[in-house]
Amino acid sequence: MLMEHPSRIGKYEVEAYLGGGMSRVYRAKDSVLGRRVALKVLADSAASDPEAKAKFLQEARLASSIAHENIIAVYDFGEEDGRPFMVMEFLEGESLRVAIEKRRTGDFARRLQIALQVGRAIGYIHLKKVVHRDIKPENIHVDPLGRAKLMDFGIAKPDDVRLADTGFTVGTPYYMSPEQVLGQDVTNQADVYSFGVLLYELLAGKKPIEAENSEKIFHKILHDPLDLEPLHEAAVAPAVIDLIRKCMAKPPAERPRGFGIVCGAIEETLRQGALQPRPAPAGTTAEPSFEDEMPPFLQGLPAPLRTLGGLAFLAGIATLLATAVIYFGLRLARVI
């Protein structure tokens, strides 16, 4: 039987269904505070499974204990009528997966800035002794200003806890480290590897490994050398290519030891300004951005003003100035 969409859960008034599978996500309103939130509810079929229920609540407890500007905030969690729910901040924008597919990630510098924010978020959870284990574009949200937020701690685990699922592959095939593929217990280094895959895809516009099924993907992860040619073709800075190569080293010990090193390398590239735009692959066209469609005289404005909000602000100032000119002009005419 299909789960009926609730009209209210606790103090949260449901406004719209946003999507989901094992969990349903809704846009809702906190009737006490008046703020808009995202409400994640475990579906009926999963709510009747004690293990699924326990994992959902574990995710909620873990995520609610983490506070960082680049990690989605969890405000509340609980259970109503046997269904666990989680209340998160409501985000405008889209997933990084959608942004990559629609070529809305911006220029090379903007893409590096997105990666840097993600790296800082992962570094923070590592300081909290948490391994995410599922770093991928679908689990990163990007707003219209390019602010990135890491989300979905569904299979995250405390770094010092050995889970019962060791011996099984846990994660998303394309982004799994070799040790995840082998079903070994993972450390922070697994997230470093997955970040390398994400950075590769973000800059090259394609995954480093392509295959038609999980078995072939796993074989390539374990045995095939990393193909760096797409990164060279995309004119990615050599220092960043080297960083990706190190992050995606098959032995965990050969990867950078922590995101302080990873983020430092990205920051250095941004400081040096050794950035090249990525040419569009043959036969593809990027969707024009809001800035691309501006008249040339507006494209010279500072970045904060090259947005709908910024232009609205300028329009308001212009209207006030025009009104003032007319008003004082009429006053002057009366005096004369």
Stretch-by-stretch model annotation:
Residues 122, 141, 172-277:
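C-terminal lobe helix-coil module of Hanks-type protein kinase domains
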Residues 77:
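Activation-segment/catalytic-loop signature of the eukaryotic protein kinase fold
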Residues 81-95, 99:
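Conserved short submotifs of the Hanks-type protein kinase catalytic core
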Residues 24:
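Conserved N-lobe ATP-binding subsite of Hanks-type protein kinase domains
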Residues 120-130:
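Protein kinase catalytic-loop region centered on the HRD/HxD motif
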Residues 43-65:
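AlphaC helix of the eukaryotic protein kinase fold
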Residues 114-115:
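Activation segment signature within eukaryotic-like protein kinase domains
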